Amino acid sequence: MALIIPEKFQHILRVMNTNIDGKRKIMFAMTAIKGMGRRYANVVCKKADVDITKRAGELSEDEIERVITIMSNPRQYKIPNWFLNRQKDVKDGKYSQVMSNALDNKLREDLERLKKIRAHRGLRHYWGLRVRGQHTKTTGRRGRTVGVAKKK
């Protein structure tokens, strides 16, 4: 960071219900938002014509607004479908970028749907077991331990 802090420097920005550190570079500061990675942040900054070498606190109100609008509706700004984190949604078949609280809600809804239709994945989630085909004979043991009775 520069030795002299600019006059209109914001140390903390509030974007999409998340506090963003103003001292970090904009591309990396945006990754504090849940559902936002470095690659997506980079694309959003380029589409918004924001210099990625700038610190998050140095951005003007106009630049912040542009970044937020592109983050919230990326398909209007020609960000490809394969770049988005919610592809072919089960309910409506749409492509979207889900972030912050909406991401948690979508994940919970997906798990509830899997449990409701009694899918194998849903049942494994319900039982608290490994879901993705891992072995469970020896690893992943937790909870109360069962001791072995000693011979007299």
Curated annotation (Swiss-Prot):
<dbReference type="InterPro" id="IPR018269">
    <property type="entry name" value="Ribosomal_uS13_CS"/>
</dbReference>
<comment type="function">
    <text>Located at the top of the head of the 40S subunit, it contacts several helices of the 18S rRNA.</text>
</comment>
<keyword id="KW-0963">Cytoplasm</keyword>
<dbReference type="InterPro" id="IPR010979">
    <property type="entry name" value="Ribosomal_uS13-like_H2TH"/>
</dbReference>
<dbReference type="InterPro" id="IPR027437">
    <property type="entry name" value="Rbsml_uS13_C"/>
</dbReference>
<dbReference type="GO" id="GO:0019843">
    <property type="term" value="F:rRNA binding"/>
</dbReference>
<dbReference type="GO" id="GO:0006412">
    <property type="term" value="P:translation"/>
</dbReference>
<protein>
    <recommendedName>
        <fullName>Small ribosomal subunit protein uS13</fullName>
    </recommendedName>
</protein>
<dbReference type="Pfam" id="PF00416">
    <property type="entry name" value="Ribosomal_S13"/>
</dbReference>
<dbReference type="GO" id="GO:0003735">
    <property type="term" value="F:structural constituent of ribosome"/>
</dbReference>
<dbReference type="GO" id="GO:0005829">
    <property type="term" value="C:cytosol"/>
</dbReference>
<keyword id="KW-0687">Ribonucleoprotein</keyword>
<comment type="similarity">
    <text>Belongs to the universal ribosomal protein uS13 family.</text>
</comment>
<dbReference type="GO" id="GO:0015935">
    <property type="term" value="C:small ribosomal subunit"/>
</dbReference>
<keyword id="KW-0689">Ribosomal protein</keyword>
<keyword id="KW-0699">rRNA-binding</keyword>
<dbReference type="InterPro" id="IPR001892">
    <property type="entry name" value="Ribosomal_uS13"/>
</dbReference>
<keyword id="KW-0694">RNA-binding</keyword>
